[in-house]
Amino acid sequence: MKKILIVDDEPNIVMSLEYTFKKNNFEVFIARDGQEAIDFLKSIYPDIIILDVMMPMVDGYATLEHIKKDKNLTHTKVIFLSAKNKESDIQKGLDLGADAYLTKPFSVKKIVEQVMELI
């Protein structure tokens, strides 16, 4: 069973994605902010992470920088999912090492397709 970590501070988005990925036979983990995600990543090694950019405590960009430094996570794919939709925001996410950058509002179908493509 593939593992996915969803990192977002919006409860409705988290619930929707959690339901969708459980239905698609993923083991789902949830973090509400970047610091919680970093703490999770000390003990779980997901196949893929869906990561919001704008969150309290530690933002998505800083969280991704941490992920990229962790040798246990070298094969983990990261998709940014964010309301920050300027070209410069998208480019920053990709430059930091994200495998994809999707913008809100989003299509659940598109996210599932992107995840399946990456794993």
Predicted stretch roles:
Residues F106-V115:
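C-terminal output helix
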Residues M55:
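Receiver (REC) domain active-site loop signature in two-component systems and cognate sites
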Residues P11-F29, L118:
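Two-component/phosphorelay signaling modules centered on CheY-like receiver
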Residues I30-I48:
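Acidic, metal-coordinating helix/loop segments flanking the phosphotransfer/catalytic sites
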